[in-house]
């Protein structure tokens, strides 16, 4: 497949082979895209570089989205390497694990602000810098999770994702005049490193499997396929969208009574 042949893009947020960002990376590489990757610190460097090499990528950067100067430097480095960029995948999020369980009411100011900076505002900052080296037809994609409802053990991350989804719409408006598209994928629960921080995750997976329309959970390859579409020219008319990849769960009105019999 050569859907992405000649296109270059940045992947932010790969942690290991179970990462949603890795599933997206594989599909993009299979379609002919040339990829660059970010990591944070030596521990992730040891994981990310071998994965990048599997996709014939030698372009990797250490970058901390908490620091504005590092985001600016990241895209300066990409400009030096490639000149221009066609797409960015933002799969970056953080919250103190201890504050995901219990009541949202007990979220600390420090964790709220840090979680919002990393999980939400970083996408706006990335979009701003990426747009400087992105030609018309460029595309930005971020990852979210069911933010229209209150999810147990998700707390401040749910609030961050709500803000992130609002950011997608405003960024789509701002960048649309330049021919750039901005979208998000809202995936169902997937067994990733990030998801392991959510309490009662096994119940979440089982509930989604039992009550989604397709009666299964999605995986990183399902998300990768949708990301490929959204980042490719096939989605030239699509922007500002929250695209659900959750086996239909977000459209469930109430569970089927047969599942409780």
Residue ranges and their predicted role:
Residues 2-37:
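Canonical Rossmann dinucleotide-binding motif of NAD(H)/NADP(H)-dependent dehydrogenases/reductases
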Residues 13-20, 93-128, 132, 136-178, ...:
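Catalytic loop of short-chain dehydrogenase/reductase
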Residues 63, 67-72, 76, 80-81, ...:
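Conserved mid-core segment of classical short-chain dehydrogenase/reductases
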Residues 176, 181, 238-240:
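Short, small/polar-rich loop/turn modules that mediate ligand/substrate recognition or access, typified
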Residues 181-191, 231, 244-246:
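Conserved SDR Rossmann-fold cofactor-binding beta-strand/turn motif
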């Amino acid at each position: 497949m050569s859907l992405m042949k000649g296109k270059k893009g940045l992947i932010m947020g790969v942690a290991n082979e179970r990462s949603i960002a890795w599933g997206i990376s594989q599909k993009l590489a299979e379609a002919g895209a040339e990829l660059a990757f970010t990591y944070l610190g030596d521990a992730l460097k040891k994981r990310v570089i071998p994965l990048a090499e599997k996709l014939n990528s030698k372009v990797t950067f250490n970058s901390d989205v908490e620091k504005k100067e590092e985001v600016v430097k990241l895209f300066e480095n990409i400009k030096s390497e490639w000149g221009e960029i066609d797409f960015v995948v933002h799969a970056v999020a953080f919250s103190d694990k201890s504050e995901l369980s219990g009541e949202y009411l007990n979220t600390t100011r420090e964790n709220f602000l840090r979680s919002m900076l990393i999980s939400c505002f970083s996408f706006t900052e990335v979009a701003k810098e990426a747009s400087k080296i992105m030609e018309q037809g460029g595309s930005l994609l971020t990852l979210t999770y069911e933010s229209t409802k209150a999810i147990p053990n998700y707390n401040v991350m749910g609030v961050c994702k709500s803000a992130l989804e609002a950011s997608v719409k405003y960024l789509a408006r701002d960048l649309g005049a330049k021919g750039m598209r901005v979208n998000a994928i809202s995936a169902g629960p997937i067994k990733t490193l990030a998801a392991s921080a959510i309490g009662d995750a096994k119940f979440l997976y089982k509930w989604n499997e039992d009550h989604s329309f397709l009666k299964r959970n999605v995986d990183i390859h399902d998300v990768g396929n949708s990301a490929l579409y959204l980042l490719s020219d096939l989605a030239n008319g699509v922007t500002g969208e929250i695209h659900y990849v959750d086996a239909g769960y977000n459209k469930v009105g109430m569970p089927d009574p047969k599942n409780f019999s």
